[in-house]
């Protein structure tokens, strides 16, 4: 199973995306901030990240750069 991390600060949208992906057969992890996204990324085997670029605690582009160096 492929695992997808959804980093989206809008709770309802985050839940809707995760629900839709789960129904399509993917494993999903939801995070509502860059910090919780980093935690989920390190804690789980993530194959794909769906990322909001405007997060309350950091810009999504910074998150992408962080992933690149992991």
Language model segments and positions:
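N-terminal/domain-start alpha-helical segments
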Residues: 1-70
């Amino acid at each position: 199973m492929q695992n997808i991390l959804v980093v989206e600060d809008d709770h309802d949208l985050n839940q809707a995306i995760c629900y839709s992906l789960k129904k399509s057969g993917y494993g999903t992890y939801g995070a509502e901030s860059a910090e919780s996204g980093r935690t989920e990324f390190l804690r789980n085997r993530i194959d794909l990240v769906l990322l909001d670029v405007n997060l309350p605690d950091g810009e999504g582009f910074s998150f992408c750069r962080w992933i690149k160096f992991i």
